[in-house]
Amino acid sequence: MKIDILSLFPEYFDSPLRSSILGRAIKRGLLDIQSRDIREFGLGKWKQVDDAPFNHDGMLLMAEPVVKAIRHVKRSDSKVVYLSPQGQLLTAKKSRELAQCSHLIFLCGHYEGIDERALESEVDEEISIGDYVLTNGGIAALVVIDALSRFIPGVLGNQESADKDSMENGLLEGPQYTRPRVFEGREVPEVLLHGDHQAIAKWRKQISLDRTRERRPDLYIRYLYDRENEEVTQQETDLKQSMLEGESAVILEVEDLHRSRKFYSKMFRLNQPVNNRLHIPGKTQMTIHLQEVGLKSKNIVLLSLRLGCKDDFFSFLGRWKMLGGTLEQADDRGEVRLVRDFDGHVWAISCKQAE
C-alpha cells in the first residue's frame, strides 16, 4: 500500500514511521509512506499557505496550495482522506476498509482548518478519531495509519491476532493473565488453569459481553443491532428484544424508590404508578417494575425507545437532562443517543426520521 501524508510539518512523522511495527513494515516494502510539505505548493516568493478567514479569528489553510498538493500526488486509484472531528468516527470496520485501498492520501489540518472549497473539490472522506480537537491533524493521521496497517497481510507477525483482537467482534476484550497464579492475593480465574478450551471460550465470551455492557454501552447496543440475524445466546436474545422491540415487562433495580418513581413519572408524563409499576405508552406497551435495593450493587439494564419525530427526540433529551438524568454519547453512526438515569440504567433513544 502507498500512503502520502500532506502536512505543514512533514518531519513530524519521521520517528513514528521508523519505529516498531510500522518501521519494519516500511523496510520490508509492505508499506510505502511519504510525508510531504504543503508549503512546497505555497503562493508567491514566501510560499504562503495560510490567510485570515472571513469574519473569523485565527488563520486558515488556503484552498489553492492544498489543492495543488493533493493533485501533485493524486492518481486514478487514490482515496483522499481529511482528518477532522467532523468526520466519521474511526472504527475497526473502517480501518479494515481503508486497508483495502491501494493509495491513500491523508490531508492534515492545521490552525483553524482548511478552506472549505479545497475539501469540496478534492476530499473523498473525512475521518475523526474522537470528539476532541488536536493541535494538528498529524496525530490523527498516525492513529489511522497504525490502525489500518494491522489489516495489511504481513504487517503483523500473526495475522490471526488482528482478527481476534479486542473490538474486532464489536466487543471489548476480557482480562488477560500470566504467571504467577497468585499475585498479592489475587488469583487467576480457575477456569483458565485446566485446559478446557470450550469452557475457556465460553468464559471469555461472557466476560467480554459483561465488560462491554458495563463500560461501553454504546458499543454493546451496536453489537446487538449488528447481530440481529445471527445466532446469539439466550442472554443476548433477551436484551436484544428489549432493545429492538421493547419487552412486556422489565425490572429496574433502584436505590431510592420515591426518587425513581418521581423521575420516570415526569419523564413519561404518567400518573402515579400503581404498585411501583410504570406503563410506558407506545406500540409495545412496556411495563417497568421499580424495585428498591438501596445501596446494594444493581443489575444495570439497557432499554430502547424510538420516538416519532425529531421534535419529540430533542424534547425528550431536554426533559431527561432537566430532571437530573445524564446525557451520554451517540453511537458511532449518530443514530442513537444514550442517556442514564440516577441508578445507571441506560436508555438508547432514537427517532424514526434518523433511521
Swiss-Prot record:
Keyword Methyltransferase included in the entry's annotation: yes
Catalytic activity, as annotated: guanosine(37) in tRNA + S-adenosyl-L-methionine = N(1)-methylguanosine(37) in tRNA + S-adenosyl-L-homocysteine + H(+)
GO CC terms, sorted: cytosol
Cellular localisation: Cytoplasm
GO biological process: tRNA N1-guanine methylation
GO molecular function terms noted in the UniProt entry: tRNA (guanine(37)-N1)-methyltransferase activity
HAMAP family referenced in this protein's UniProt entry, alphabetically: TrmD
Family, as annotated: Belongs to the RNA methyltransferase TrmD family.
Protein name according to UniProt: tRNA (guanine-N(1)-)-methyltransferase
Native organism: Chlamydia abortus (strain DSM 27085 / S26/3)
Lineage: Bacteria, Pseudomonadati, Chlamydiota, Chlamydiia, Chlamydiales
